[in-house]
Amino acid sequence: MVINQKNLSSPVAPYDKSGSQSSTKADIPSINYTVDHSFQKRETSGKELSEATPQVTQSLSNQLILTTLNDLYNWARLSSLWPLLYGTSCCFIEFASLLGSRFDFDRFGLVPRSSPRQADLIITAGTVTMKMAPSLVRLYEQMPEPKYVIAMGACTITGGMFSTDSYSTVRGVDKLIPVDVYLPGCPPKPEAIIDAVIKLRKKVAQEDFVERNNFRQIHRYYSISHEFKSSSTVHTGKYLQSSERKSPPKELSEATGIPIQFILKNTQKTEIQP
C-alpha cells in the first residue's frame, strides 16, 4: 500500500470572533490514497533461507526454559505436597516437631491440612487399631487423585510391639491402603521424615502423566491375615458374685484375732440416723 500525502503544509484555518475555528472545504488538506495490488515474487536460494533462520545463541538459551508438559506437571505436584494430619500414637509427636521453626518443613512446599479433600499425602503416624481401620480407609478414599501414603513407625508397618499377642492392632497399614514409602523407627526422628519426603518427591518426579493409571497400586491386602488361637475364658465375672468374695476368709480373722465377719454383719444392720 502506497500513500501519497499532499498539501500537508497548508496553513491552519483562522479562528472567528466566537472562538471557533472557521474552516471551509478548500482549507482542508487533501490526501490521496493509492493502493498497489501488485506483488513481486522473488526466489530465495537455500543460502538466503539459512541466513533468515534464527540461530540459538548463548544469550537466547539463557532466557528460555525448554521442558515438557509431563515434567512441568510432576514439578508442580512434588513442590506442593499437602499432608493430612493423621496421628494415632506417639509417632505423631515427632511429626509435630517437624512443624516448628527448627526443621521448617514448609521449605518443601508441605502445607498441613485437616481435611482429606484438600490433601494429597497422608502420613500414618502411630498404631492403627481395627476400630480405626474403617475410618482410615474412608479418609484415604476421600483424598483426590493422585495421592500418596507414608507409613511412619514400626507400629504402622508391622504392628510393632503389639504384633505378637494384641487382639486389636492391625499388623501393617498396607493391608488397608497402598503404601508408597516405608519409614521404620520407634519413633523415627524428624530428619528421617524429611528423608522420606525427599524419596517421595523423587518418585513423583519419575511418574508419567499419561501412564499414571497403569502404575496405580491395586493389591492392597498383601500381607498375611491374623492367626489367633481360641482358648477358654479366664475371667467370666462370676467370681465377683461369689460368697467368698463378699465375706473375708476365715484365715484372715484367725490371724488378726478380730471377728471380722461379726463386725461386718453388725455394720450392715445398723442404720445411720440423720
Swiss-Prot record:
Root EC class: translocase
Keyword Nuclease among UniProt keywords: no
InterPro entries tied to this protein: NADH_UbQ_OxRdtase-like_20kDa, NADH_UQ_OxRdtase_20Kd_su
UniProtKB keywords: 4Fe-4S, Chloroplast, Iron, Iron-sulfur, Membrane, Metal-binding, NAD, NADP, Plastid, Plastoquinone, Quinone, Thylakoid, Translocase, Transport
Superkingdom of origin organism: Eukaryota
Region (Disordered): 1-27
GO process annotations (BP): aerobic respiration; electron transport coupled proton transport; photosynthesis, light reaction
Bias (Polar residues) ranges: 1-10, 18-27
Coiled-coil residues: none
Residues binding [4Fe-4S] cluster, per UniProt: 90-91, 155, 186
GO cellular component: chloroplast thylakoid membrane; respiratory chain complex I
Cofactor stoichiometry and binding remark: Binds 1 [4Fe-4S] cluster.
Molecular function via GO: 4 iron, 4 sulfur cluster binding; iron ion binding; NADH dehydrogenase (ubiquinone) activity; quinone binding
SUBUNIT field: NDH is composed of at least 16 different subunits, 5 of which are encoded in the nucleus.
Protein's UniProt name: NAD(P)H-quinone oxidoreductase subunit K, chloroplastic
Organism for this UniProt entry: Chlorokybus atmophyticus
